[in-house]
Amino acid sequence: MQSKAHLCPKCGENTIYFDGICHSCRQKQRREEILNLSADEVEAMILKIADRIDEIEKWDEIYNDFWALFSLLGIHDPRIARAAAAAEIYCPPELYFCAPKDVRDALVRKLASLQDNAKNTLNDVLCALAWQGDEQTTQLFYELYQNPKPWRQKLYAGTEIYAQIGGWSFDEAGERKSLVFNKCLAVVRARDSAEKNGGCASERGDENANEILNFKGGAGSANSEQNTQKDVDEISNLHAGAQSARTGMDEDASLRNERVNFKADAQKDASSGLNLSENAKDARCECANQNADEPVQIGRPTGQKCEFCGCEMLDMLRLKADEPRLAFLNLKRDAIFRCCPTCVGSVRYFCKRSPDGEIELSHDGEGFDENYFSQEDFARLCGMKFKLGGEVSPFYGCFSELDTTVGGYPQWVQDAEYLTCPSCGGTMKHLAQIPFGEMIEGEGVIYVQICEKCEVLGGCFQCT
């Protein structure tokens, strides 16, 4: 029996129509369970997944267990990959991330055996190879790009696009380029004391934290056939980052190749005459007070008006270049991605800093004629506080649309959509994933990307 609309009793924010807690809170509970697994429990899950690999395409227990270990703990065990290859199971393709060469060879043999009437299997095997992604796979993809097989005509894209599914690409000369940062940091929301039901779980003690670190050392041996002390140290740091991300929450409660010209002057002119509601004004003041010192800021008002719908533009993401924890991004100056929260669903935005530090904004696509972003959502988003956490698994953002991640791998809702830099024409690199729908009780994800050469930021939006 359907209940009347009410707020989730755990978070006090999301509206639900059933007994229990909202989807976001259930996912957070599941995440907590996985991050607290012992080494023995993880080993048991790995063996169960490998033994019951034929069930993974049912999208039930085995699929969920694999996805949790892979995304939250970064576990990609060769035993699982070998079991999948032996059973000729290729979905999800992440099963084959960094799989050993014998698994790669099995995938290559399968690809060679396929005919042009096996379109779906061709697609699945190419995706699996893209996630395996070693040097020989790169060479194979380049050869298929130069000399396509007859079955290429049956596919929507060539191997140069399939490679992007695995987070890499290659140029006309076959030189490989990574489209992701291997390091990933979580950006967690810090609950304001004035919000309802601000707390989630109680803060964990040192004893439990040590158990997590000890487990991570054991999990490292599952990820590699050669367990080194370096692996243990790196994975222990990963778990410490995941722990700090959770503690932070508890403490504070297809590609387009057309080049576009920057239109800074037009955007500056459009910003004149902006008339904000009282809620929006309050949100701007609150945002300035709450986030000024944070190295990562999300949803900062700008006073600039969208040329399409009239909604206020937001600096959806700001990263401080001088933050030591963000040094792996190699930012030369603060990175700012600005967009309209209404039109980001249909427009790809690009941002570049002018010599005087101003944002030069350009776009690809047409926005909406009407502003659909409510003042309530505007005030809610701009009033949120966020904190930069520690290092987590590179696939942390792939578990669920819960937290913003900087670096790491994106979890595409649809197909991989790496943008083309409007300045140099090169393929941009994934920078951050923002679960926009999670913040406004809606749906969809904003993917922020960067051209390291031109210092241009771009962004696109995907939803189901």
Protein language model regions, located:
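Preference for intrinsically disordered or flexible, low-complexity segments
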Residues: 2-199, 266, 278, 285-464
